[in-house]
Amino acid sequence: MSTLVTSPGATVAAGATRAPSQWAQRLPIAAVVLALFGWLLWSVSSRQALLLLVGVGLGWGLAAARFGFTTGWRILVEQRDPSGVYGQIILLALLAAVSMPMLAHFPETHAALGPPSISLLVGAFVFGLCMQIADGCGSGTLYKAGLGVPLNMAILPLFALGSFLGSVHLNGWLALGALEPVGLVQSFGATGALLATLAALAVVAVLVGLWSGQRFSLRRMPRRWVWGAVVLALFAALNLLIAGQPWGVVYGFGLWAAKGATALGLFDPTQNAFWSDPGH
């Protein structure tokens, strides 16, 4: 067999098998996605098929840009590096600029409005604490589990269980005290809502800059936070347009667990206030 000399004392067989390229490794995943897209298009609806592609796009944006909501706040607190939080501010600003006009002019789109409540404050604190411990929010846990990270693969079923249990007891939590939901678009119109949102984001950016000592600057930010924000804003807007509701992850986790509990005969959704609602 002929050999090729690559360096003194080192040779490689000319016919040696090369390591598969990244594209070759991704080909089976692409084939599965394409097959699932075709099945949804044929058996379910074009809407669900398109939402599959939107979900793939969101997952790709999160993984390729390593765009983490949990990570952004952690590096701000631990290292006083505001890049991740600034990336999230860019994402929210872009998405607000696209989604608020849609919510105002397309009646088939609906905002995810919930009542400000004691349960919201308690839940936000517990969720924020746990996502730092688990190294991921809902979307982060899902895409890291998809990448094969053992920690997140173990957390995923527990996340689903927790979401399900929270939905089952939702009415009891709301009974602790809640106000009426407030929709900025309904209250101020698309323009007023957008201006209010951008102003609030600007205040957050200023406060973060003062605390970290690094003012907001696109030139100083790592590129992945910028283009990741653009990609996620694009696909989140497409999700709103196609699904008629905002991008949400945690509801899906609870739905998986609810379906599993129902299939095992452990839960009757018709006897629960949340799951018996036609919207759920």
Put a short name on every predicted segment.
Residues 1-280:
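Membrane-interfacial helix-loop segments of redox and metal-homeostasis proteins
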